[in-house]
Regions:
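RecA-like P-loop NTPase motor core of helicase/translocase proteins
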Residues: 1-294
């Protein structure tokens, strides 16, 4: 659907999601809502080649991965899915989804890029994500009340919903996780723990907060970093899920977006449900075509 979004220079300007963005969102919504997939076993019936077995799924919770080439708008996909989960939990009876979201990035560079969209929750109001109040007899704008918490700067938790935006290092449980040569980022292993700086010296520890809430949906940007169950990133999510199980709850869903959903051996993640490669993005002029000098 095209959404009118006039500007000074172009009064007829319209906003429209790319096909690949819509495909990623629609695939996840279809698997969850239409065919009601809730665990790794439910995905096996869609393997038409019969090459996937349950032992290939290293997690016991429901995880879905979308492959999107760099520069094709992964943040847009995450924002749509976040709104979908929020209103599903708000308006649907017995919804298993969540109004609390842990959005994990691999490093500060990626976090700062996403933060420009999420600061002030502006992406949800700049993009056509919220239907007007009264549509389908619901107060969409009024009911969309989320609090944004960045890194360990956690304010009062909002009973109506929270977004925790962080890099993965804030989620590690340092008591159980020590720097290792096998880590994706070996800097701490070789150089030791980073010194505490003014911006790191926070009173609230994010990893303790997310382990204490009763409902949570996790989103991972640049999710190719979770390619091994031995890595601290995977173990941190597993720990969150296990804590929820102890409270008779569970992780609502894990959604991963990455341009390279592959293990070190080259095998694609079995949880991958949509694929938008760079070659296709270039051909459709979604990203710039590289030019080689003579």
């Amino acid at each position: 659907t095209k959404h009118p979004r006039p500007t000074t220079n172009n009064p007829e300007n319209c906003f429209e999601y790319f096909f690949a963005q819509r495909e990623s969102v629609e695939t996840i919504v279809y698997l969850y809502e239409v065919v009601e997939c809730r665990n790794p076993q439910d995905l096996l019936k869609y393997d038409i080649h019969g090459s996937i077995v349950i032992s290939m799924f290293e997690e016991s919770w429901f995880r879905l991965v979308t492959k999107q080439a760099t520069g094709t708008g992964k943040t847009k996909v995450l924002s749509v899915l976040l709104v979908w989960s929020y209103f599903h939990k708000t308006y649907e009876d017995d919804s298993d989804l969540s109004r609390n979201f842990l959005l994990i990035t691999p490093n500060i560079i990626v976090l700062d890029r996403i933060r420009t969209d999420f600061d002030g929750l502006k992406i949800f109001f700049d993009d056509p994500l919220l239907p007007p109040n009264g549509y389908d007899d619901q107060n969409w704008n009024s009911d969309f009340q989320l609090s944004l918490h960045i890194q360990d700067e956690v304010g009062t938790l909002n009973k109506k919903g929270n977004i925790f935006l962080t890099n993965i290092h804030r989620v590690y449980d340092r008591k159980d996780s020590h720097p290792s040569y096998d880590d994706e980022n070996t800097m701490d292993y070789f150089l030791g723990d980073k010194p505490v700086t003014k911006t790191q010296n926070n009173k609230v520890v994010l990893r303790d907060i997310v382990r204490d809430i009763d409902e949570l949906l996790i989103m991972n940007d640049e999710a190719h970093h979770i390619h091994d169950s031995k890595l601290s990133w995977f173990k941190s999510i597993q720990d969150i899920h296990n804590n929820l199980l102890q409270k008779n709850c569970r992780l609502s869903l894990q959604i991963d977006v990455t341009a390279t959903p592959k293990h070190d051996n080259g095998n694609i993640f079995v949880q991958t449900v949509s694929d938008y490669p760079l070659v296709e993005a270039i051909a459709q002029r979604v990203v710039k075509r590289p030019v080689l000098p003579d």
